[in-house]
Amino acid sequence: MSEVKWDKEKIKSILPHREPFLFIDEVIEINGTEKVVAVKNIKDNESFFEGHFPGKPIMPGVLIIEAMAQASIILYYICKPELAKTHPNYYLGKVKAEFLSPVVPGDKLILETINVKIIDEAGVVDALARVGDRIVAKANFVLGIKKNEPHEILS
């Protein structure tokens, strides 16, 4: 196991996402090419709380999946750094998810991703989202990449 601390700038150098759609604040653990653990701190003023739900804010499940998917991209980057450096387009081919408990303002969302099988342009990743010891969601992703042509790469 490797204890690490990647800040938001390091994360932005890997993920194509930006605020308000960047759902990883830090990476706290990397275990070789097997596991990545990341954190999203859920703030009171997150824009999605305005409508989901007024007076009883709950993080939408689809955004928990997005956070787990972003952690999975970081795992992919660690497994395939040379391919990842070409800034490919990432996509989810299949998602199987289960939601177990709500995520609310003030929660520290821990995102664990496990490499089931990552090959050149695709992978299968198991993901778990938790707050403390409470599991809030589980997912299995089949993800893929589409290589960009040199003129398509965003700088």
Task: List the model feature ranges, each with a label.
Residues 1-29, 155:
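N-terminal leader/capping segments at the start of a protein or of a new domain
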Residues 3, 104-107, 115-155:
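HotDog/MaoC-like acyl-thioester-processing domains
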Residues 19-59:
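Catalytic strand-loop segment that frames the active site of acyl-thioester-processing enzymes
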Residues 21-23, 109-110, 123:
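Hydrophobic core residues within well-ordered beta-strands of beta-rich domains
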Residues 25-28, 100, 112-116:
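Conserved positions in beta-strands of structured domains
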Residues 50-74, 91-92:
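Compact, glycine-rich, soluble single-domain proteins
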